[in-house]
Amino acid sequence: GDVYKRQSEEIQMDIFITIIVTFFAGMGAGLGTGFAGMSAAAVISPMLISFLKMDPYMAVGIALSSDVLASAISAYTYGKNKNLDIKNGLIMMVSVLVFTFIGSYIASLLPSTTMGNFSVIMTFFLGVKFILKPVMATKESMSDVPAKKRAIQSLACGILIGFICGFVGAGGGMMMLLILTSVLGYELKTAVGTSVFIMTFTALTGAVSHFAIGGMPDIPVFVLCVVFTFIWARIAAIFANKAKPETLNRVTGVILMLLGIVVFVFSFFN
C-alpha cells in the first residue's frame, strides 16, 4: 500500500509542478505576445526544458503551437482596434515563410552552431531600447510613405527576417518588432499587431513541421501551455490597445527586459 501511496503522491506532485510551470511559461509567453509581438518559443521552450526535463525539439514544437492561438487572438484584438497593416503584413509573411525554408535549408548544410542566447540578449536590449528611446511614430507619419515603397520595404524586410529565423531558428517576433519600428517606421501598436498577424502563420508552419518530424507532443503539457498562453495574450492585447503610446513603450520595454533576464537565468540552469 505504501508504494502505491507514494506513487500516487509523486504523480500528484508531478501534475502540480506541470501546472505551475506551464502557467508561468504561458503567462510570460502570453504577455510577451500580446504586448510586444514576441514569440512564445523564447519563454516556453527553456521553461519546459529546465523544469519538466522535456526534449528540446518537443518543447519548441509545443511553444510554437502556443504561439499560434496566442498570436491569432492578439492579431484579432489589434485588428479590431485598427492597429494592423494586413496588406503589407501579407507581403512580409509570404517572404518570411519562403526565406525561413531557404535559411533553414542552408543552416542544415553547415556545421551546427547554436545561437541560443542570441535571441535572449536581443530581447533584453530591445526592452532597454523601448524604455530609453520609445517608438513615437504615429499613424499620420506612417501614411507619409508611398504605398509602393512600403510594399517593397515589406518584401525586403520579410526576406531578411525569414532568412535569420530559418538560419538561427529564433522566433521572428523580436526581429519583426525591431524592423517594423526602426526600419519601416511603424507606430508601436501597428507594429505589434502586424507582427502577431505574421507570427500566427509562421508559428503554425513551424509547429506542424516540428510534430511531423518529432511525433506527437505530451498532450497535457501541450494543452496547458496553449490555453494559458492564449488567456494571457488576450488580456495583454486588450490592455495594449487601450494604452497610451508612452505607457505602452514602457510596459513593452519592462516585459521584454524581464523575459530576457528570466530566460537568460534559465539557460544557466541547464
Q: Model-flagged regions — what are they?
A:
Residues M13-T18, T22, S65-Y76, A170-L180:
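Hydrophobic, membrane-facing alpha-helical anchors
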Residues M54-I62, K87-N88, G185-V196:
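Membrane-interface alpha-helices at helix entry/exit sites of multi-pass transporters
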Residues S66, T194-H210, P220-A233:
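A small-residue-rich subset of transmembrane alpha-helices
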Residues G30, V60-V68, V192-A203, L256:
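Transmembrane helix-bundle signature of multi-pass membrane transporters/permeases
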Residues F35-I44, G169-I179:
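Transmembrane helix boundary and interhelical junction motifs in multipass membrane proteins
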Residues K5-L31, S45, I49-F51, P56, ...:
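Juxtamembrane transmembrane-helix boundary motif
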Residues G1-D2:
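Extracellular interaction modules
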